[in-house]
Amino acid sequence: MTTIILYIHVLSLVYWLGGDLGTFLSSRYIVRDELGVEARKTAFSILQECDLGPKLAMPLTLGSGFHLTATYWPNLFVSFAIPMVWLVVLLWLSLVYFQHHSGGNPRIATADLWLRYGVLLLGSFFAFKAWQAGLANWVALKMAVFLSLVGLGIAVRYALKPFALAYVRMVTEGATAETNDAMRHHLAVCRRYVWVIWIGLFVNAALGLRLVNV
């Protein structure tokens, strides 16, 4: 069972990075002035499909990572901690799936956002408590990095709101210098967060492989 969970944990990293890269590259074509609106809409559709991978990978990383941690340090967690966390993961995955296939239902999006806040706050509390109780430094650091990535994901969501407004204006009214500049600017802000997310994933991979000792 542990091997399967580890396999899921590794695949989650692969899909997170791979999907993020596809999202990053396709976003470039949305802001290319020389492309027509239809071509840019196609690029946006590709972006949305690529982005599903990282959105699914984040909760799976949480579930598999916690499962492994609780398996190797069982004395630090209550007996029902693993199924409880997997229930949260299943809820999170459901919200991601239905949000993707509902065309961005605002209620589902809000529920997903609040769940992320809950993961960030409660995860930080329990990770700190586990570290105080004797959790290995490298695992505690991995948890801290992951929770930072959750926070950065929330920041990306807020940064994308003005981009989305400019994109809708482009689709409904046609491309203008104003909408092009707005999309380019807000997408550049999001990319800064994405770069930091990638660095965090590289750091966590190094910690997990024990390439870095802390």
Model-assigned labels for residue ranges:
Residues M1-V214:
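Polytopic transmembrane helical bundles with strong interfacial aromatic enrichment
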